[in-house]
Amino acid sequence: MSKSMYGYVRDAWKKPAESGVKKLLWERMQTWRRQGAVVRLERPTRIDRARELGYKAKQGIIVVRASIRRGGRRKSRYIRGRRTNRMGMRKATPGKNLQSIAEERAATRYPNMEVLNSYWVGQDGKSKYYEVILVDRNSPSVLADKNLAWVADTRGRVFRGKTSAGRRARGLHNRGTGTEKCRPSLTSHKNQGK
């Protein structure tokens, strides 16, 4: 069976050093670092991944690149004239992954749109870069699309952990033994699920 163009693009991203994607990313990231936290793009960087996640080149659908700092939460040291025992310094991590935080920032920048999904496009020593697919919930071309019309019925899905990255942060990508306390929600089991 013959392979499609998307298959070749996918293979190139799976082996970046051999395919030349690594060098291309290294060059592009020098530009990305100088740009803002959320930048609107003309077209997706990874067309194969974008199409897998529901992207279509039509009115009402845009792609933005969101950059977010790497590592744990930046928490300031407790300075109150004494040393507290724990200081609340170590292991202070947010309850969600960086990808879902990047999605939320993109959604805040474009309040008339809903986050459909997102995917990784690169990282360096300080930042991670994700491309977020946003859908205009009032666009006629979106409302006429049988695969995307459901977006018009939802509001703020990214802030409720309904995207793929959000569901992963809630522990819903796992099934079977050991995941009993992830459903119906983490708070219903006193956050013992993760």
UniProtKB/Swiss-Prot annotation:
Biased composition (Polar residues): 185-194
Aminoacyl-tRNA synthetase as UniProt keyword: no
GO molecular function (one): RNA binding
Domain of life, per lineage: Archaea
UniProt keyword terms in alphabetical order: Ribonucleoprotein, Ribosomal protein
GO biological process, one term: cytoplasmic translation
GO cellular component, one term: cytosolic large ribosomal subunit
Region (Disordered): 162-194
InterPro entries according to UniProt: Rbsml_eL15_core_dom_sf, Ribosomal_eL15, Ribosomal_eL15_arc, Ribosomal_eL15_CS, Ribosomal_uL23/eL15/eS24_sf
NCBIfam families hit by this protein: PRK04243.1
Name of the featured protein: Large ribosomal subunit protein eL15
Organism phylogeny: Archaea, Methanobacteriati, Methanobacteriota, Stenosarchaea group, Methanomicrobia
